[in-house]
Amino acid sequence: STFQHSQPFNFQYNSKSNLLLPYFYPMMNTALSKKIPVLIGHVVFAILTAMAAHFWQERTLILDAAFQSYHFIAAGQPAIMVERFGAASVQLLPLLGVWAGASLSTVLLLYSVSIVLFHWLAFSICLHVLKDKKAALAILLFNVLLVGDSFYWMQNELLQAISLLFVLWSIWLRREDWS
């Protein structure tokens, strides 16, 4: 016998977004359903932060990350390579560790975690300050979908620039609200 639904799907037309939404849409319009995406975003970034802390050696002791780590630890100031000034923002947390006299493993752990915290901060600014859920979701999806390709190549400034771009785009779209 073939499978039959006990009730046919009831689709409603939503003129706001021009989408056909399933019959359960009214149930999704509750206070809890509005908090779930926010919670999911923060949970995902918390997991990414925990992963960055757990895999700090794999993330910081290879290739460019090790080279840049050596330079900012030895100099005690941000290591700006090839005019990539965005790298200074993620080197501030490990530099605080250097200035406080923390061990090498602690400084490298802070460096590994600071990359994820940068993206989490961009996500939080879009979500909570600018009230732009779409930009926040874009940052979240960008980080989750590219984590397989970029998780261990952490100091790629392009990824930081794209997260920052979402924040700046969100600010640009709201420029008339502030005038």
Model segments located where?
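Cationic, low-complexity basic patches in intrinsically disordered or flexible, solvent-exposed regions
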Residues: 5-8, 13
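Start-transfer (signal-anchor) and selected internal transmembrane alpha helices
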Residues: 18, 22-50
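Extracytoplasmic catalytic/substrate-binding loops of multi-pass membrane glycan-assembly enzymes
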Residues: 53-71, 80-93
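Loop-to-helix entry region of an early transmembrane alpha helix in multi-pass inner-membrane enzymes
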Residues: 100-120
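Transmembrane-helix motifs of polytopic, lipid-linked glycan transferases
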Residues: 113-133
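Transmembrane-helix signature of polytopic, membrane-embedded enzymes
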Residues: 126-146
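Aromatic- and kink-enriched transmembrane "portal" helix at the membrane-lumen/periplasm boundary
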Residues: 140-163
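Membrane-interface transmembrane helices that cradle and orient dolichyl/undecaprenyl
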Residues: 167-178
